[in-house]
Amino acid sequence: MEAKTAQAVAKYVRTSPRKVRQVIDLIRGKSVADAFAILKFTPVKSAADVAKVLKSAVANAEHNYEMNTADLYVQTCFVDQGPSMKRISPRAQGRADVIKKRMSHITVIVAEKPAKPAAAKKDPKAAAAKADANAGTKEG
């Protein structure tokens, strides 16, 4: 059975994708509660943007798919590059340099943790037979 997922996307965020990826890498695979705690104490501007997207993904999971928010974890999260605004910086002797102000598209996908399968119970007869077989091989 495939796990249900919910996603949220923030487009045209005015932060370089390279800087956002540093924050995204911290929360990938973590539970939602852990991810929020990590983002709260990450002293980077983009942490607030990522937290906003994560909060939206959790709200989507709860509202659209009726998932239990306590069981959610960050299944995947990634950052794509958006368009760049080009600005000019004047240089010496009439020249100009182009400054690219980059944008990011942040995507966060949350899913419910898969239920742990019931632990397979060992057959007591098989375990006893194996113990007897091992006991016969040891001679002092």
Curated annotation (Swiss-Prot):
GO terms for biological process: translation. Keywords: Ribonucleoprotein, Ribosomal protein, RNA-binding, rRNA-binding. One of its GO terms (molecular function) is rRNA binding. GO terms for cellular component: cytosolic large ribosomal subunit. Residues 115-140 are annotated as: Disordered. SUPFAM superfamilies: Ribosomal protein L22. CDD domains: Ribosomal_L22. Part of the 50S ribosomal subunit. Belongs to the universal ribosomal protein uL22 family. This protein binds specifically to 23S rRNA; its binding is stimulated by other ribosomal proteins, e.g. L4, L17, and L20. It is important during the early stages of 50S assembly. It makes multiple contacts with different domains of the 23S rRNA in the assembled 50S subunit and ribosome. The globular domain of the protein is located near the polypeptide exit tunnel on the outside of the subunit, while an extended beta-hairpin is found that lines the wall of the exit tunnel in the center of the 70S ribosome. This is Large ribosomal subunit protein uL22. The lineage of its organism: Bacteria, Bacillati, Bacillota, Clostridia, Eubacteriales.
